[in-house]
Amino acid sequence: MKQITFAPRNHLLTNTNTWTPDSQWLVFDVRPSGASFTGETIERVNIHTGEVEVIYRASQGAHVGVVTVHPKSDKYVFIHGPENPDETWHYDFHHRRGVIAKGGKVSNLDAMDITAPYTPGALRGGSHVHVFSPDGERVSFTYNDHVMHQLDSALDLRNVGVAAPFGPVNVQKQHPREYSGSHWCVLVSKTTPTPQPGSDEINRAYEEGWVGNHALAFIGDTLSPKGEKVPELFIVELPQDEAGWKAAGDAPLSGTETTLPAPPRGVGQRRLTFTHHR
């Protein structure tokens, strides 16, 4: 074991996918305090020489962090907070986006449209902890929704989503904080504010992980028959082609003014564990 960074600041590794494909570099973000999201750079360090490179530097008062690496190429994805934050719009669970950096160029991963009627393929809030699939084609993330947060913060439930390579998604901006993105984004989990005790319903989906290239496992918070929170493991199988990603089910992919975005047709989570019986 050896120390490879020495600067008097916090160097934070994401909990997955921090090695470059050649196994020579580790990527990290830098924060004055480990508990705050106030870093301005995404960096990497060579594990042999200790050389540090800045991959991206934020501007206009924005902050960045939680970086992961593409499995096959020199490409990085990370959280980007809002530029020019103010009292009405600053970094929060529902005010952040994914950004991809490659070859010195950056682009928004997810689009955001918070003005009805909402744009299919765009999100309406903030994405978080972006992770490439093993083949590098898709990106998973967790999500919180601005529209539902404005309606009632209790309805802004954490969910799991996927960015698929079927963009770009161009938003006709009607709000200064809206933006377009490179990928088609949808939610793949389904939550409810009031799960039925003892059922498979959940009010929170999080900590997802890839199972091959076409499925995600995640933790969902259920209620036991006694009404106690019990985190359980779920799995969801994903569409195989562009048509599948863009096909709406019983509810709109982009959501409504009173409902969250819905998964594509045929995409449904399945419960794997039943630990509340213990």
What does each model-found stretch correspond to?
Residues 1-278:
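Sequence signature of WD/YWTD-type beta-propeller architectures
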